């Protein structure tokens, strides 16, 4: 059995940030990721980040990912790809499938940064080829250079929906419309404005009624909904499309954490059932930490900061970082996080995180 001081499950922005922060202080770290390349969602993000320079504004996601990989390599972080963690057991033991063999490893501290999967919605024809998640479309276009379709209907107007719509147009596809059952656009205005300027219609208070086609998508019908989300008869509109992209939110991938016995709570504002954790990102199971979308759906910049906080906490708990230095550096990360949890969207997520912290402390009951 191989033993490590710290194991990171997931080589996305949260996992890499945690690994880098811990390794800076001397912690021995290995990162396992099921994919054949590290970086998580960053390498699909060809758009520029916005906000402050501190949060990598005006940099594209893939360039940020490359900088993380280079820094991790320089610090001696080991990255094991095509490696699936099958389970986390007592005392930090894990089973990992590395390519075609199963290995047993053990960690003094574990960081779970497994991210999230895409939500889907059922409707007549939803299993036809051509109905795909928006994230899958983004992977096809930005990672593999394959255009998902020629004519696309986007279901969902959150950040993922509007960003991927624009990227599909950059890839040469036509976006027939962006629809959403909500009455207002959910994505940031800076992203939605790019779509609006191209003339693509936003149909708010609309949902998809049916996908048409026999062996593939050949069209889609949408319908308006009322304030109670009920379809309004006679408001149907048909679009001739060959692809329907679904962008209706993400679901945190908490399977390993639930297997390990971590306390959870249901928090709709952050994506569903999540691991309760303290301000150091540590869960109810001592030695298991979380960061990124698995601990609540937020931005990539937030995932990075959470990863850094967890990395600092792990370095401190292993004796590599003294108390004053730990508190000072953690305070700096909290201050950086505060800027991301401002505004209407950010404040809501911040309050939801406070609830998870309260569940962890036992001052509130989990739903």
Q: Which residue stretches match the model-derived regions?
A:
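Short, charged, surface-exposed secondary-structure boundary motifs
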Residues: 141-145, 185-191, 211-212, 274-278
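A conserved FAD-binding loop/helix module that cradles the flavin
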Residues: 291-329
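A Rossmann-like FAD-binding core segment of flavoenzymes
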Residues: 67, 72-88, 94, 169-258
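Conserved acidic residues
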Residues: 5, 108, 176, 242, ...
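FAD-binding core/adjacent interface of flavoenzyme oxidoreductases
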Residues: 1-9, 66-151, 227-234, 245, ...
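FAD-site-proximal beta/loop scaffold in flavoenzymes
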Residues: 133-141, 243-295
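Glycine- and aromatic-enriched mobile tails/lids
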Residues: 1, 317-367
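Beta1-alpha1 glycine-rich phosphate/pyrophosphate-binding loop at the start
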Residues: 4-63, 148-191, 266-271
């Amino acid at each position: 059995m191989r033993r490590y001081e710290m194991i990171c499950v997931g080589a996305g922005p949260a996992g890499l940030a945690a690994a880098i922060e811990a390794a800076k202080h001397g912690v021995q770290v290995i990162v396992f990721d099921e994919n054949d390349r590290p970086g998580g969602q960053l390498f699909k993000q060809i758009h520029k980040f916005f906000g402050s320079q501190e949060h990598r504004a005006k940099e594209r996601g893939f360039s940020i990912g490359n900088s993380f990989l280079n820094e991790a390599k320089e610090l001696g972080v080991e990255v094991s790809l095509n490696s699936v963690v099958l389970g986390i057991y007592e005392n930090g033991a894990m089973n990992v499938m590395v390519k075609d063999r199963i290995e047993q490893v053990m960690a003094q501290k574990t960081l779970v940064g497994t991210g999230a999967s895409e939500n889907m919605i059922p409707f007549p024809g939803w299993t036809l080829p051509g109905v795909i998640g928006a994230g899958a479309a983004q992977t096809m276009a930005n990672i593999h250079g394959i255009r998902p379709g020629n004519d696309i209907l986007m279901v969902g107007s959150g950040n993922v929906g509007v960003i991927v719509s624009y990227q599909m147009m950059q890839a040469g596809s036509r976006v027939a419309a962006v629809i959403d059952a909500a009455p207002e656009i959910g994505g940031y205005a800076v992203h939605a404005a790019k779509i609006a300027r191209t003339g693509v219609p936003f149909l708010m208070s609309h949902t998809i009624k049916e996908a048409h086609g026999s062996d593939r998508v050949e069209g889609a019908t949408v319908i308006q909904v009322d304030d109670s989300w009920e379809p309004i008869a006679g408001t149907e509109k048909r679009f001739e499309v060959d692809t329907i992209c679904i962008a209706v939110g993400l679901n945190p991938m908490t399977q390993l954490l639930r297997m390990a016995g971590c306390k959870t709570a249901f928090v709709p504002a952050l994506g569903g059932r999540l691991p309760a954790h303290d301000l150091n990102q540590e869960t109810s199971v001592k030695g298991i930490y979380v960061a990124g979308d698995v601990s609540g759906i937020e931005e990539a910049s937030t995932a990075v900061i959470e990863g850094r906080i967890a990395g600092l906490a792990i370095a401190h708990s292993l004796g590599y970082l003294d108390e004053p230095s730990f508190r000072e550096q953690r305070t700096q990360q909290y201050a950086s996080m505060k800027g991301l949890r401002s505004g209407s969207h950010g404040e809501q997520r911040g309050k939801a995180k406070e609830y998870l912290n309260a569940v962890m402390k036992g001052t509130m009951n989990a739903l």
